[in-house]
């Protein structure tokens, strides 16, 4: 499927739309679905030591993860995988997944969502999930609004 994208975007390190997800996850969107006619999002996630999202599923989006820094435990559909720097994981839609930075230092991954539009989810989720005493029901409602379901808590190290 060809996507007609005529907008040119060039960004240097650290540039892009900065958003925050849950505690310990900062995001830098290099392009959003708005830039790509809905085709994809491309963003960097700075993951705190031993940080990662809760177990969840995307009902419509596929996700890829490319590890730039750190070592990650990735849960994909009931299987556990360990991915080092330079490693890659493809997470199909409708498959439960989560990841965890296993290192004592911050990790960094590139994430691509297909189709795009994920930045809107993070714009809404960030302030809610980072609030003191974050309301899990409110967080779950944001997931549902954007075509995802929260299934459990974050992964733990072995």
Give residue spans per PLM region.
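Ligand-binding loop in jelly-roll beta-barrel domains
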Residues: 36, 93-119
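A hydrophobic, small-residue-rich beta->alpha segment in the mid-to-C-terminal subdomain
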Residues: 108, 119-132
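Glycine- and acidic-residue-biased ligand/ion/polar-headgroup-sensing regions
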Residues: 60-72, 77
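A short, N-terminal "cap"/entry segment at the start of jelly-roll beta-barrel domains
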Residues: 1-40, 132-158
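Short acidic-glycine-tyrosine-enriched beta hairpin
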Residues: 10-12, 78-96
């Amino acid at each position: 499927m060809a996507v007609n994208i005529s907008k040119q975007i060039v960004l240097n390190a650290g540039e892009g739309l900065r958003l925050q997800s849950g505690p310990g996850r900062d995001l830098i969107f290099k392009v959003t679905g708005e830039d790509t006619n809905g085709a994809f999002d491309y963003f960097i996630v700075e993951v705190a030591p031993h940080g990662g999202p809760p177990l969840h599923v995307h009902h419509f989006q596929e996700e890829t993860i490319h590890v730039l820094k750190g070592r990650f435990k990735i849960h994909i559909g009931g299987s556990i995988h360990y991915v080092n720097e330079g490693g890659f994981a493809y997470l199909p839609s409708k498959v439960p997944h989560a990841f965890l930075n296993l290192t004592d230092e911050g990790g960094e991954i590139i994430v691509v969502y297909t189709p795009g539009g994920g930045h809107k989810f993070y714009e809404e989720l960030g302030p809610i999930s980072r609030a003191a005493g974050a309301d899990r029901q409110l967080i779950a409602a944001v997931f549902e609004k954007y075509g995802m379901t929260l299934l459990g808590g974050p992964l733990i190290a072995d």
